[in-house]
């Protein structure tokens, strides 16, 4: 193609640079020139995931829109792998974070793939809440021209297994969409199932769309942010524990630890809002108990990932022993023909309740039977890392990462039980002992890019962790925006986590306001949501002034109660009805002014 020479006097190029540019592009087609133009514009104007806007598909386009709705990173990894598979066969795909997806364009989609996880009691992941609400609202459009597929990730230890995926799948079909494939629901060991599904959906999509030279996707949110690190979930950093300090009082009902991990010269980087993945080993005493309950020796060889290991080593390093599931109970009952457990199999609610209340070791104790080693490991699920909200900013702590860990401890008929990862960190790692870790980036829980923007932080218990990171970062940035903390726990004297630090931030003026809710210090229980209502007028003024709202804590109770309180504040002081308030809060969520890190 021949292009007309531009007037060189009007260009920021010297004649030699212009000549090289013309020589390089002389045989380009108009489409290729347009692509190069967009490429260099993208180089000049890089956008972060938080600010990027998803590209709307052209009407009639057969490009594939791939939505990632992730809570802990697993759905994102599956979506990214599918994107790579599609690009490898020259299919045009646009991968977009559910939080960045312009959902009002959904009726324009021809080919839509959703990869989603589930959180809490069957809710969609945080980044997909707005999309979920829209699809279930009266505003949802007909999707008669849309073909779709859903891959759902979940955990069978929870009652509402893969519920978000079921919701999306059923609603997309109800709105007129055509299923490309039946929905697939995957448990925590999802990798093999995901690989099989990816191969199937790629074949289906190849038959539905022409093969072209793919256009590189416009950055479409957090799924496309590049976090380069040699350390991953599959290849974690071997770091060392440097501090393990109990930060609740001696009379507290809670055992909360401040944990510091030395990253050394690894170069591992994180941002406030990220989580730390921790691989742990099961308690050797628990392993011994399970082996003895089944009349095994512990040296029996079992297959793990294609290798033969002694049973005790396999149980300590490779299998989940502290979380029971309905599936494990059902399979154990069927294998052993247990007179007590078999009647539960036909009652889903009772089965789920029993699994939630009875650890694996106690199930074996209460319903004893003899299993061989292979049958035992066949019952169990693979050990997976635990994620903890990071409680520090590298701007302050540099080569360290801090955690706020609530140690899970309870008794079953006089026998002490504990959480796998929390007790590992609190009880079984020596000073400078090894901890295998990785960063799980969370681009859906980020400080405002403008340091002048006020922030409202709402947390209870260990939900204080990311806000400690936030305030450290705001201090390091010398951010002028106001900071308001709402924090709740049972007792002021026993459970005020990081009390000295927060009081110092108040004294220095960095923490503009702090409201504390102590639920057990008086006859009437007071929670953070009560403090939100109490401060409603001022809270609304902050929101009106552009404040970003952050919530961290329990998904099933605290986060729901906080959201209800926020809606009531918006209704009372914003002059809206409940439906309008709900829409307003959804708009804040879409604008990333309402972000939650809940578990």
From Swiss-Prot:
InterPro entries with a match to the protein in the record: CysJ, CysJ-like_FAD-binding, CysJ_Proteobact, FAD-bd_FR_type, Flavdoxin-like, Flavodoxin/NO_synth, Flavoprot_Pyr_Nucl_cyt_Rdtase, Flavoprotein-like_sf
Keyword Amino-acid biosynthesis: yes
One function term, GO molecular function aspect: flavin adenine dinucleotide binding
SUPFAM superfamilies associated with the record: Ferredoxin reductase-like, C-terminal NADP-linked domain (SSF52343), Flavoproteins (SSF52218), Riboflavin synthase domain-like (SSF63380)
Signal peptide: none
Binding annotation for FMN: 70-75, 117-120, 153-162
Residues engaged in binding NADP(+): 519-520, 525-529, 561
Pathway assigned to this chain's UniProt record: Sulfur metabolism; hydrogen sulfide biosynthesis; hydrogen sulfide from sulfite (NADPH route): step 1/1
Cofactor binding comment, as recorded: Binds 1 FAD per subunit.
Pfam families per UniProt: FAD_binding_1, Flavodoxin_1, NAD_binding_1
Entry EC number(s): 1.8.1.2
Domain FAD-binding FR-type per the UniProt entry, residue ranges: 234-448
GO process terms (BP): cysteine biosynthetic process; hydrogen sulfide biosynthetic process; sulfate assimilation
Annotated positions binding FAD: 322, 356, 386-389, 404-406, 410, 419-422, 599
Cross-referenced NCBIfam families: cysJ, PRK10953.1
Family of the protein in this entry: Belongs to the NADPH-dependent sulphite reductase flavoprotein subunit CysJ family.
Subunit structure: Alpha(8)-beta(8). The alpha component is a flavoprotein, the beta component is a hemoprotein.
Protein name: Sulfite reductase [NADPH] flavoprotein alpha-component
The gene coding this protein: cysJ
């Amino acid at each position: 193609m021949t292009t007309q020479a531009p007037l060189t006097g009007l260009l920021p190029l010297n004649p030699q640079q212009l000549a090289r540019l013309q020589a390089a592009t002389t045989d380009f087609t108009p489409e290729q020139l347009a692509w190069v133009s967009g490429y260099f514009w993208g180089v000049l104007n890089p956008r972060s995931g938080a600010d990027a806007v998803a590209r709307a598909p052209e009407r009639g386009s057969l490009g594939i829109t791939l939505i990632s709705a992730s809570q802990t990173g697993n759905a994102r990894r599956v979506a990214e792998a599918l994107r790579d598979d599609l690009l490898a066969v020259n299919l045009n795909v646009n991968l977009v974070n559910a939080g960045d997806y312009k959902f009002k364009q959904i009726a324009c989609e021809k080919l839509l793939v959703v990869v989603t996880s589930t959180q809490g009691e069957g809710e969609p992941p945080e980044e997909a809440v707005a999309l979920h609400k829209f699809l279930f609202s009266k505003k949802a459009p007909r999707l008669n021209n849309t073909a779709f597929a859903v891959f759902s990730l979940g955990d069978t230890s929870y009652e509402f297994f893969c519920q978000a995926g079921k919701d999306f799948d059923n609603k997309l079909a109800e709105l007129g969409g055509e299923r490309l494939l039946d929905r697939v629901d995957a448990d925590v060991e999802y990798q093999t199932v995901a690989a099989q599904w990816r191969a199937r959906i790629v074949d289906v999509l190849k038959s539905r769309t022409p093969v072209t030279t793919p256009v590189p996707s416009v950055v479409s949110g957090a799924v496309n942010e590049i976090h380069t690190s040699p350390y991953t979930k599959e290849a974690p950093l071997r770091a060392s524990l440097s501090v393990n300090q109990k930060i609740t009082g001696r009379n507290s009902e809670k055992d909360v630890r401040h944990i510091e991990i030395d990253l050394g010269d690894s170069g591992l980087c994180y941002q406030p809002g990220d989580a730390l993945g921790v691989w742990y080993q099961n308690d050797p005493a628990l392993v011994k108990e399970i082996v003895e309950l089944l009349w095994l020796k512990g040296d029996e060889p079992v297959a793990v990932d294609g290798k033969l290991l002694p049973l005790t080593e396999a149980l300590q390093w490779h299998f989940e022993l502290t979380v029971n599931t309905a599936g494990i109970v059902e399979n154990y009952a069927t294998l052993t023909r247990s007179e007590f457990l078999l009647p539960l199999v036909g009652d889903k609610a009772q089965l789920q309740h029993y699994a939630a209340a009875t650890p694996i070791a106690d199930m074996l104790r209460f319903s004893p039977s003899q299993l061989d080693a292979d049958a035992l490991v066949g019952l169990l699920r693979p050990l997976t890392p635990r994620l903890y909200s990071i409680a520090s900013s590298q701007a302050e702590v540099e080569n360290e990462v801090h955690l706020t860990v609530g140690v899970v401890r309870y008794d079953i008929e006089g026998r002490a039980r504990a959480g796998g990862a929390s007790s590992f960190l609190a009880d079984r790692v020596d000073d400078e002992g090894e901890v295998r870790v990785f960063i799980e980036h969370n681009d859906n829980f980020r400080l405002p890019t403008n340091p002048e923007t006020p922030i409202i932080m709402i947390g209870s218990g260990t939900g204080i962790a990311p806000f400690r990171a936030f305030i450290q970062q705001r201090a390091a940035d010398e951010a002028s925006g106001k900071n308001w903390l709402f924090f709740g726990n049972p007792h002021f004297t026993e459970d005020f986590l990081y009390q000295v630090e927060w009081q110092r931030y108040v004294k220095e003026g960095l923490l503009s306001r702090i409201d504390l809710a102590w639920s057990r210090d008086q006859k009437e229980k007071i929670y953070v949501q009560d403090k939100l209502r109490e401060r409603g007028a001022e809270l609304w003024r902050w929101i009106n002034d552009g404040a970003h709202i952050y919530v961290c804590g329990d998904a099933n109770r605290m986060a729901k109660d906080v959201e209800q309180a926020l809606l009531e504040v918006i209704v009372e002081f914003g002059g809206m009805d409940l439906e309008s308030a709900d829409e307003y809060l959804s708009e804040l969520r879409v604008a990333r002014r309402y972000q939650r890190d809940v578990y």
